[in-house]
UniProtKB/Swiss-Prot annotation:
Main location group: secreted
Short name of one Pfam family: Kunitz_BPTI
Family, per entry: Belongs to the venom Kunitz-type family.
GO molecular function: serine-type endopeptidase inhibitor activity; toxin activity
Domain of life of the native organism: Eukaryota
InterPro entries from the UniProt entry: Kunitz_BPTI, Kunitz_BPTI_sf, Prtase_inh_Kunz-CS, TFPI/VKTCI-like
Example of a GO cellular component annotation carried by this entry: extracellular space
Record protein name field: Kunitz-type serine protease inhibitor homolog beta-bungarotoxin B1 chain
Disulfide bridge positions per record: 31-81, 40-64, 56-77
Job description of the protein: Beta-bungarotoxin is a presynaptic neurotoxin of the venom. The B chain is homologous to venom basic protease inhibitors but has no protease inhibitor activity and is non-toxic.
Assembly and binders: Heterodimer; disulfide-linked. The A chain has phospholipase A2 activity and the B chain shows homology with the basic protease inhibitors.
Tissue expression from the record: Expressed by the venom gland.
Signal peptide: 1-24
Amino acid sequence: MSSGGLLLLLGLLTLCAELTPVSSRQRHRDCDKPPDKGNCGSVRRAFYYDTRLKTCKAFPYRGCNGNGNHFKTETLCRCECLVYP
């Protein structure tokens, strides 16, 4: 991984760590919605929260519309959707 990629990853992890602990706040309101691929032409890899498996999973997102249960990275998905006891 390039140094730029490592810096980005470190920044995302730091952001996640600085957020209020997930156990004391509500999960992102769209995390409980089913994944919606959207309807634009270009496909990119995104992540959604799977409520049944209680984890973030990759899926092909078409870049617009859909619902809010899509995140650019697995880390962002985990930060917004995982609730720890």
